[in-house]
Amino acid sequence: MEIQSNFSLKNYNTFGIEAKAKQFIAVHSVEELKTILKENKNEKKFILGGGSNMLLTKDIDALVIHIDLKGKEIIKEDDDFVWVESQAGETWHDFVLWTIDNNFGGLENMSLIPGNVGTTPVQNIGAYGTEIKDTFVSCNAINIETQETKTFTNAECNFGYRESIFKNEVKDQFIITSVIYKLTKRNHKINTSYGDILAELAKNNISEPTLKDVSNAVIAIRQSKLPDPKELGNSGSFFKNPILLKSDFEQIHKKFPEMKFYEVSETEVKVPAGWLIEQAGFKGKRFGDAGVHKNQALVLVNYGNATGQEILNVSKEVQKTVFETFGIKIEAEVNVI
């Protein structure tokens, strides 16, 4: 295990932003992780996973610990369900494909989401009607201060829309090392409630979709709308879809009757942030090397040599204009560093 100094993080964040780490080390086992934490107790630390949900606006004046724990295994099963444990450093999409290849259901709608397994509970990632909380059983984590292992159950994670205990009450206190999911072995609950998925399946004349069919449909949709970070730096959806009280939404809807929305409860509706941003005139707009993607207004992109600050400035301009136009605040889903 070698600590490197003045280390470039350009290849460790999907925006492809050039930023330096004061110190950097990759860890490949829980034992290595505990040792590094113990030996560097008084150093400032920054924990790095897949780098897919962050915007680096400056160099990191800390010891960057890259979690590169690999491996996955079935830890329990019965006739109907299987409990699978994945190490935190596994690439999420590869893990999803592995579950589908084994005919384990529950994650297929979240195919092609960038990032690693370890960050999935932090954000409670989700797509096309499913979220991590639907299949999440528990995760194992190391206390940064004491190096003790703690298991967080689903209930203890306080999951909300792109929220969890790891973004709030215990933020920066734990490092997730593995995650356990409970998946179906039969009687899969195929979720094709989103119109895009139904349209993609219909295009391929599929009326009774398998897990693989749904995954392929989601992959096709995402590839048509979202740029590949290897070709164009981005972090997927930069903004959360705002959730409004119905009473507030009704007032706004009177002014903008064409506004799209989805009911999330008896008292709340979700408005697509991408629609708001597009209507505000930002879709495809470019500011130097930073901009809003031409096919999906939720996505901010680095066209080459944008700095994190330049991308942040674009996001602030988008937020300001959307609020001035619609009276709706949109929040960043990405962690700004």
From Swiss-Prot:
Residues 17-186 form the FAD-binding PCMH-type domain. It is found in: Cytoplasm. NCBIfam families: murB, PRK00046.1, PRK13903.1. One of its GO terms (molecular function) is UDP-N-acetylmuramate dehydrogenase activity. GO terms for biological process: cell division; cell wall organization; peptidoglycan biosynthetic process; regulation of cell shape. One of its GO terms (cellular component) is cytosol. Belongs to the MurB family. Keywords: Cell cycle, Cell division, Cell shape, Cell wall biogenesis/degradation, Cytoplasm, FAD, Flavoprotein, NADP, Oxidoreductase, Peptidoglycan synthesis. This is UDP-N-acetylenolpyruvoylglucosamine reductase. The keyword Transferase does not apply. Its EC number is 1.3.1.98. The active site is at 162, 237 (proton donor), 333. Pathway: Cell wall biogenesis; peptidoglycan biosynthesis. The keyword Oxidoreductase applies. It comes from Flavobacterium johnsoniae (strain ATCC 17061 / DSM 2064 / JCM 8514 / BCRC 14874 / CCUG 350202 / NBRC 14942 / NCIMB 11054 / UW101) (Cytophaga johnsonae). The lineage of its organism: Bacteria, Pseudomonadati, Bacteroidota, Flavobacteriia, Flavobacteriales. It catalyses: UDP-N-acetyl-alpha-D-muramate + NADP(+) = UDP-N-acetyl-3-O-(1-carboxyvinyl)-alpha-D-glucosamine + NADPH + H(+). Its main location: cytoplasm. Transmembrane segments: none annotated. It is an enzyme of class 1 (oxidoreductase). Cell wall formation. Its cofactor is FAD.
